[in-house]
Amino acid sequence: MQLLNIYNTLAREKQPFVPIEPGKVRMYVCGMTVYDYCHVGHARVMVVFDMVHRWLRAAGYDVTFVQNITDIDDKIIRRAAENGETIGQLTTRFIQYMHEDADALGIVRPDHEPRATDYVPQMLDLIGKLEANGLAYQATDGDVNYSVRKFDGYGKLSGKSLEDLRAGERVTANDAKQDPLDFVLWKSAKESEPPESKWNSKWGMGRPGWHIECSAMSCTLLGEHFDIHGGGADLQFPHHENEIAQSEGASGKPFVNVWMHNGFVRVNDEKMSKSLGNFFTIREVLKEYDAEVVRFFILRAHYRSPLNYSDAHLDDARHALTRLYTALKDTQPGGYAVDWEEAHAKRFAEAMCDDFNTPIAVSVLFDLASEVNRTGSSVAARQLKGLAGTLGLLERDPHTFLQGGKKVDGPSPDEIEGLIAARKTAKAERNFAEADRIRADLLAAGIVLEDKPGGATEWRRA
């Protein structure tokens, strides 16, 4: 297989991927803050890094994949108080919902899914190292802050100097900070906050800042220097910049070799956000569309490109995925093993090894589907199913998918079968006008009938 090249945000270019330990990859991806339902932006992070995880394994790497859960922060404390429940009750419920969404989207569970509240001792240890290295200080308000001016490499991920960052970023004024860009490592507790949101430390009762959580969990589980760190583009600054400052400031070692960031999800060319009111949860979308359609919609775009969300784009993805499943419906492809020496597989691998170029990889799947339709080749069908499987696609029985589709009001499977039986009776009675009417009515309802040799009729949703 070809050498893998990945766009490294830190270097601002594609680079050959060379793991720290030959044959092994250690990867960390920033996960969810569990106080609300996951939205389509979260779905993109899930699917993109699941795709990366799957391809690394397909390429023969032994992957250790860590994705954290943020189960303590201001929003969580606030939401639990609003609901009149404990923080644990709130986060447990939304972790379950997150897992349900991820499972529906075909996400392979990470090897480790650390919760921030289980790693507070490691966070305190890391803050202590930063203080000992002269990079952290306790402010007059009780918070422990990171002193960005004392870390020479601050800004290297975003490519901005401290002066640029101070001028261009919205930084909340705080007289207790030595620099407006300084960020909280340990947040001093307030009397009004619940006991389960506070831990004891040498700096007093409090809780960890958001950024220190990821540094502590990633370094504990993957080591102080690991291969890949991923997340959404919105995390590049300040979150990932601050992770670098914390981790390298404590260890004196390079933190991560390759930084990967997926692009935003946009609605009508605006970033999806609650404030703009163009916000869709995964659950809302899955009421309307099959989960594999949503996964396919995400994978048709390059992971670094903006992804424009609309019903029209999802409908187009549904039709396209239907074409792929239709190519497999009359074949018995057997096993899923890929022949990587075959021409289509080589093109597919070349695309995936070029910074995970899924649009090109998906185009290879359509080329294979055309060959299956043209020749009925079981070899091509096996390749189609096997290659798609590396993307988490085409893993269901084709007929199951083809009789699903968009989840809208329409005839149920039993109603469709009843109408097919009525059409068969009409044809037997030579009432072809009635048979044609039934076919036309079903087509208007989005149901396509296909008459097979021997008198059988199959159906699928358009």
Swiss-Prot record:
Binding site for Zn(2+): 30, 214, 239, 243
Positions that bind ATP: 274
Family annotation (SUPFAM superfamilies): Anticodon-binding domain of a subclass of class I aminoacyl-tRNA synthetases (SSF47323), Nucleotidylyl transferase (SSF52374)
One of the GO BP terms on file: cysteinyl-tRNA aminoacylation
Catalyzed reactions per annotation: tRNA(Cys) + L-cysteine + ATP = L-cysteinyl-tRNA(Cys) + AMP + diphosphate
Keyword field contains Transcription: no
UniProt short sequence motif 'HIGH' region, positions renumbered to this chain: 32-42
GO CC annotation, single: cytosol
EC number(s) given by UniProt: 6.1.1.16
Motif ('KMSKS' region): 271-275
Source superkingdom: Bacteria
Subcellular location: Cytoplasm
Swiss-Prot/TrEMBL cofactor(s): Zn(2+)
Entry GO MF terms: ATP binding; cysteine-tRNA ligase activity; zinc ion binding
Coiled coil spans: none
Keyword annotations: Aminoacyl-tRNA synthetase, ATP-binding, Cytoplasm, Ligase, Metal-binding, Nucleotide-binding, Protein biosynthesis, Zinc
InterPro entries hit by this protein: Cys-tRNA-ligase, Cys-tRNA-synt_Ia_DALR, Cys-tRNA/MSH_ligase, CysS_C, Rossmann-like_a/b/a_fold, tRNA-synt_1_cat_dom, tRNAsynth_Ia_anticodon-bd
Cofactor: record remark: Binds 1 zinc ion per subunit.
Main localization category: cytoplasm
Subunit structure: Monomer.
NCBIfam families noted in UniProt: cysS
Family statement: Belongs to the class-I aminoacyl-tRNA synthetase family.
Name listed for the protein in its UniProt record: Cysteine--tRNA ligase
Originating species: Cupriavidus pinatubonensis (strain JMP 134 / LMG 1197)
Gene: cysS
